[in-house]
Amino acid sequence: CDWSSDVCSSDLLCIAVMPLVKPEWWEKHQAHAVILWSLLFAIPFALFYGAPKAVETVLECLIGDYLTFIVLLFGLFCVAGNIKLEGSLVGNPKVNVIMLAVGTFFSSCIGTTGASMLFVRPIIQMNSWRKNKRHIMVFFIFLVSNIGGCLTPIGDPPLLMGFSRGVSFFWSMRLFPVLVLNMILLLTIFYHLDKKAYQKDITKGLMPEVKENEPLIRIKGAHNFLYIVMIVIAVILSGVLPKLSAFQNAAGEVIGIPIFREVTLTVPAIIEIAIILLAALLSFKTTPKEVRVQNHFTWGAIQEVAVLFIGIFITMQPALMVLKSAGSGLGITKPFEMFWATGALSSFLDNTPTYLVFLTTAGAMHFTTGVATTLGVVPVKMLMAISCGAVFMGANTYIGNAPNFMVKSLSDENGINMPSFFGYMWWSLRSEERRVGK
């Protein structure tokens, strides 16, 4: 699989480099680039393993993983775009810290994607008067789009996969002290950075608009929170329904619509997709268009994510196949090794299958004490390490977690000059150094 792993690496490198060297070309032709890299994987794969196996692998990726992934992003993007937070709040270091902290805790309630889409526009609007603000969105990605999702299976898809394999729903609340420690460190770093940037803006004569007779916060489209709850319920059902006998055949397999060979669109997935799309439709039908206009709502961000991630999902299959086949032969047996291995791979591959690979590896080590899962008993510290690695390290790159790229795209749309792919990685590494330094 060396050649196909090279395709995945080249695809990621293309995403990283092309916006820097040929930004206009990339904006026009990113879909063509994704098709090219996908074909460079699919054609040699078909020649080596046979066309049926290649078709099955691509369809399994698209039907089994990508479809529910992009529908969830689409639903939350639509519903959050119909909610507008406004009022007299203006962006300053204290207000920004409070908003980031609240958004971080919201991530475990409505998911990192839901919280990101809900809070990103208010944060951008509150700080629209400022010039030095890219750091605000970088730390938004660190906190709201990633580490905040570690407390419940709703928060991040890897934990949902753990829940569907026997980890109790509230088990990840054990990560609360880890979350709080990281929040304190990150928000402290952020406050000092934002205070310096804020003072620079004030020195340059930039001043926020003072809104008299305005409430502190006013919410337009508040009824859309009901649709967010619908989407959260759909996500929970996707983890619960496959365990029920009513959704299993005699062999214990989840029932569904056969697509090709072993590829099946399961009934729980269909139910999840239907609920999410219904929530998005109702959101648009029941919310005045003026709310979306005031939010500067466009389809650009979700289109960009949909195009780029379909290529990433397809071309990352060889790397995941290597991981699955290697499994316990990787020689990773200690919690800290699990943390760094899961985290490093989750930075560039989808963190959900990466989490499952290492959870399966840990479950096959024949431990006798720990958390009982359908994959075997996993020691508490090892499960904590795998969970933190998958959830936290998704913040290391724009492609480590889907909300990262969504936030970047929306920030770019609103005139915030976000760091490049490698520039963002530098931010994440510097932040890690500062946390360790404290």
Where is each model-derived feature located?
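Membrane-interfacial helix-loop connectors
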Residues: P44-A46, S107, L118-N132, I136-V138, ...
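Long, contiguous bundles of hydrophobic transmembrane helices that form the permeation core
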Residues: L186-E253
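Transmembrane alpha-helix boundary signature
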Residues: L20-E24, A42-D65, F74-G91, F105-L118, ...
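Short, small-residue-biased leader/transition segments that mark boundaries at the very start
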Residues: C1-W3, V7-S9, G437
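Transmembrane helical segments that form the transport core of multi-pass membrane transport proteins
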Residues: I228-V357, T361-A364
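Alpha-helical transmembrane segments
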Residues: C61-L72, W171-I189, I259-L277, W340-A344, ...
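Interfacial loop-to-helix junctions that mark the boundaries of transmembrane helices
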Residues: S4-S5, W25-V34, V55-L67, F169-V178, ...
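Juxtamembrane and boundary regions of transmembrane helices in multi-pass small-molecule transporters
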Residues: N132, L151-T152, F170-L216, F392-K438
